[in-house]
Amino acid sequence: MIPNSSSSSILSLLVLLLFSTSSSWATNSIHEDFLNCLSIYKSSFPIPIYTSKNSSFNTLFRSSARNLRFLSPNSTQKPEFIITPTLESHVQTTVVCSKKHGLDLKVRSGGHDVEGLSYVSDSPYVMIDLVDFRNITVNVKNATAWIQAGSSLGEVYYKVGNESKNTLGFPAGFCPTVGVGGHISGGGFGSLVRKYGLASDQVIDARIVTVNGEILNKETMGKDLYWAIRGGGANNFGVLLSWKVKLVPVTPIVTVATIDRTLEQGATNLVHKWQFVADRLHEDVYIGLTMVTANTSRAGEKTVVAQFSFLFLGNTDRLLQIMEESFPELGLKRNDTTEMSWVESHVYFYRRGQPIEFLWDRDHLTKSFLKVKSDYVREPISKLGLEGIWKRYVGGDSPAMLWTPFGGRMNQISEFESPYPHRAGNIYNIMYVGNWLNENESEKQLNWMRSFYSYMGRYVSKNPRSAYLNYKDLDLGVNDNNVSEYIRYLKARSWGRKYFKNNFEKLVKVKSMVDPDNFFKNKQSIPPIRSWGKELEAINIVI
């Protein structure tokens, strides 16, 4: 990626805008003031802007918002403006003008924020939609890439695989429509997590717009902010423009497989054994586990289906040998496996049977009402415990659990290396997914999810019960803006330490330095304490 040459040239003008008074525009409303503020650059740097007067406004707003819970006409306040930047200067100007005229700012890269925090607000707001901010520049020789924040994971996978002739990859999530900006800034893991760690572990540079409209990179932002955006949620500190990442070696041919087992076929014993194997296998082997429910042959009776999904960086012969040595009970056979490229494996896991070009399709995802929760498991669950889980699980309406094994590279990285702390000692992550199509079922579905999550508490991490930032869950707690900043911080620790453990206080420190007035905020954003030094010292918290 080549940095935008206009960025530094307009910075001084942006600073003047930020600190000048709104009366200079001689307008009668914040709406007009904001438009006038943007219009200064219209002739030289046209800023794509949409208001409710545009016929495409509603379509654009809903286009990449994935969760119908936050698209109800009665529950969602729409933005005053939608900005679709194509230049870095567009983002700079939008940040400065939004702050100047008292408008909240939301930034949407892929729309997969499961609590809608990237595209809804309780206050008048501007939304930056990065749908047209998607340049990807791959350097095969150096095994690096500059990726703009609006790019989807599928676009990254396709381009990296195509340009490297299937010799390079990027370790990140399974869903190809997820936006890179938010995914990497929260950690990001998928089928290469055991081999290479998180997506955020591959970051070697970044560009971000600060609250004052300045563009910073790794060298100019300083080590604390650079640390914070790689797993602490970049939207807490600014608007992430682009990442520079390391690309990782992958074998030209990988092996994939999927095996389904019901309770009647011995799933309980296999899931129990999986807990002792999946995080200890050779790091080239990934075996993810998905649990769903299915009807049995008996009317009204359900069972649990455990689906074991394999990715192996190598050929079938070697995978069969490893499985025979480590997990023969699963019974993996040659005809269960398929050899393909690493890029093709992403189509296989997500929408089997589609052509590889499917990874470029950002619009295929069916919208639904959605609730997600998460856990980390540090001790294997007993067979008796699993049986208790199944009894409650079949009471849900088509729930899903995704168990992602760790170990390997994840055990080798310190929990303080980045804000993401869930490293050595965690056997696997659990993602709980509730998915429904009828809004009238929302209360029932949410109550079941919360009840099941409560039951699972006995089997998962404790003190704190940890959670994954990219699976945001407002049930864990929200910011209280009606109290002092110190009390707000104390309340935020209830959920902040679940996501970040002992890294939460350092994130508060960074937030307090770079955004002391809390412009970049949402219901679960990092709270600043402008006088954090004295107050944290008073309760003997060492940052």
From Swiss-Prot:
Its needed co-factors are:
FAD
Q: Where would I find the FAD-binding PCMH-type domain in this sequence?
A: 75-250
**What enzyme class is recorded for this protein?**
oxidoreductase
Q: What is its EC number?
A: 1.3.3.8
Q: Which residues are glycosylated?
A: 54, 74, 135, 142, 162, 295, 335, 440, 482
What's the superkingdom here? Eukaryota
* GO MF annotations in UniProt: FAD binding; tetrahydroberberine oxidase activity
Query: After translation, how is this protein modified?
Result: The FAD cofactor is bound via a bicovalent 6-S-cysteinyl, 8alpha-N1-histidyl FAD linkage.
Q: Which residues form the signal peptide?
A: 1-26
**Any Pfam family matching the protein:** BBE
**Entry keywords, A to Z:** Disulfide bond, FAD, Flavoprotein, Glycoprotein, Nucleotide-binding, Oxidoreductase, Signal, Thioether bond
> Which PROSITE patterns does this UniProt record tie to the protein?
FAD_PCMH
Reaction(s) the record says it catalyses? (S)-canadine + 2 O2 + H(+) = berberine + 2 H2O2
Query: What cystine linkages occur within this chain?
Result: 37-97
- What does the entry comment about cofactor binding? Binds 1 FAD per subunit in a bicovalent manner.
Q: Where is this cross-link: 6-(S-cysteinyl)-8alpha-(pros-histidyl)-FAD (His-Cys)?
A: 112-175
Which family, according to the similarity comment?
Answer: Belongs to the oxygen-dependent FAD-linked oxidoreductase family.
Give the protein's function: Catalyzes the oxidation of different tetrahydroprotoberberines, such as (S)-canadine, (S)-scoulerine and (S)-tetrahydropalmatine.
Query: Cross-referenced PANTHER family, in alphabetical order?
Result: OS08G0158400 PROTEIN
List the protein's name. Answer: Tetrahydroberberine oxidase
UniProt organism field: Argemone mexicana
